[in-house]
Amino acid sequence: MYSLDWPRAYGIPNSTATFKLFPEDFQVNELFEGQFSGEGEHIVLKIEKRGLTTEEVVKSLARLINKPIKLISYAGLKDKQALTTQWLSVHAPGEIIDGIETLEAPGWRILECTRHNKKLKPGFLSGNHFIITLRNVSDESDLVHRIEQIKFKGVPNYFGEQRFGRDGGNLIKAEEILVQGRKVKDRFLKGMYFSAARSWLYNLILSRRVKESSWNLPLLGDVIQLVGSNSIFVNDKSMDEQLLQRIGDKDVSPASPLPGRSKNLVKGTALQIINDVYEEWSAWLDGLEKNGLEEAWRANILYAEQIEYRINQGTVELSFVLPAGAYATVVLRELVQY
């Protein structure tokens, strides 16, 4: 019912590769723009984990320091089948937890320890740095050609399959709540299911644009978003040359909606594409609006910055930086079949 094989911007890659043969083949490191204050109510820990989810590390840490899980916060979730570093914060006002800076357990360890005057939460991250190893690459020249393409043109900014749960399970739960009226008391789970539903509808809209080769073009009535910002404006011209240049300069991007109560910003051709999807999924849209979700916007174009690669006898190591909320797998799927 929920196919997650979205259309690609550059066609199906010629090259195949093996991905995630080992956790070290997918390395992720969180990036922050600012610095921690060095003082405050929150102990901030830089964690290295391997083969564990963020939630599993949080539970393990909570047991070791004898604290409720609710006192531990983070800025983002990191993959299980990976080697990742991320920051966790522990609310411990005026408290010293002996030995916390050297704690470790199977699958994780603490690399750094400091304090901060705010707890970590989504929005703190500026981005993530990825180091990815692809093994048994069958067509290195095709891979390199595609890397050069996406350096300048970017890729469709789909939500990755992780967003939807195993086998789309989060979408099944969302359907039960939004259409069948099932009650879910756990606010975290409910929010996760709603996020999956909105992401699904966003991907459907973006996939229509990819099929029509308009995902990176400013249609009449499009909402345009400044890259790296939530600032938006509406394009009231058809194929504005100045706007095309700004897209080429990675300054702005056409955007698609994360559904909710609408401010009716989008118009014209862009609105028709959105309405076609909303008409098909009207029950979901009604449910999201009834649950108080507000419409938001997400750029259509994802730019992978600081791309570097090394090739060694069929193995390719890729390194790049993505903004917070973006998925490395949507970059990889434009490069190789894995």
UniProtKB/Swiss-Prot annotation:
Q: Which reaction does it catalyse?
A: uridine(13) in tRNA = pseudouridine(13) in tRNA
Give the Enzyme Commission number: 5.4.99.27
What's one GO-annotated cellular component? cytosol
What is the official name of this protein in its record?
tRNA pseudouridine synthase D
**Domain TRUD residue range list:** 154-303
Protein role: Responsible for synthesis of pseudouridine from uracil-13 in transfer RNAs.
Q: Which family does it belong to?
A: Belongs to the pseudouridine synthase TruD family.
Question: Which GO molecular function annotation, any one, does this entry have?
Answer: RNA binding
The family database entries (HAMAP family) matched by this protein are listed as: TruD
Name the enzyme group at the top EC level: isomerase
Superkingdom, taxonomy of origin: Bacteria
Indicate yes or no for the key word Hydrolase.
no
One Pfam match? TruD
Entries under PROSITE patterns matching the protein:
TRUD, UPF0024
